[in-house]
């Protein structure tokens, strides 16, 4: 699973070249990881799953990849629910992200 995650991330390095730091890293079945979507918001990952809780194979991935500052989890379809911190630094204030040159403020 970790290798599939690494491939998915590597395949999305192109958009980052223009300064984009908010993008989808994993798109479920399309990346060989059915039921899992991962969004990156300036180094803060939000893992979303359709069924069950946080995927156990993702525990410890923050240290393994030396990548995200924090990993959050939420169930897909629960838009009104705030994501739950799983690992890393907690977001306590809104923060800025850039997507295709546009700036947005995100508040978990």
Please tell me what each predicted stretch does.
Residues 2-20, 49-78:
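Cysteine-centered catalytic environments shared across enzyme families
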Residues 44-49, 105:
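Short, well-ordered strand-loop elements centered on a beta-strand within folded domains, enriched
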Residues 31-32, 39, 55-108:
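Non-catalytic substrate-recognition/targeting regions of SAM-dependent transferases
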Residues 1-44, 92-94:
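Non-catalytic accessory regions of SAM-dependent methyltransferases
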């Amino acid at each position: 699973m970790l290798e599939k995650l690494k491939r998915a991330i590597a395949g999305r390095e192109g958009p980052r070249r223009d300064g984009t730091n908010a993008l989808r890293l994993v798109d479920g079945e399309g990346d060989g990881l059915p039921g899992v979507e991962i969004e990156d918001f300036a180094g803060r990952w939000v893992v979303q799953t359709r069924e069950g809780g946080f995927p156990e194979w993702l525990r410890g991935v923050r240290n393994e990849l030396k990548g995200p500052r924090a990993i959050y989890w939420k169930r897909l379809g629960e838009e009104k629910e705030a994501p739950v911190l799983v690992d890393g630094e907690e977001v306590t204030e809104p923060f800025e992200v850039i997507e295709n040159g546009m700036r947005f403020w995100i508040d978990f």
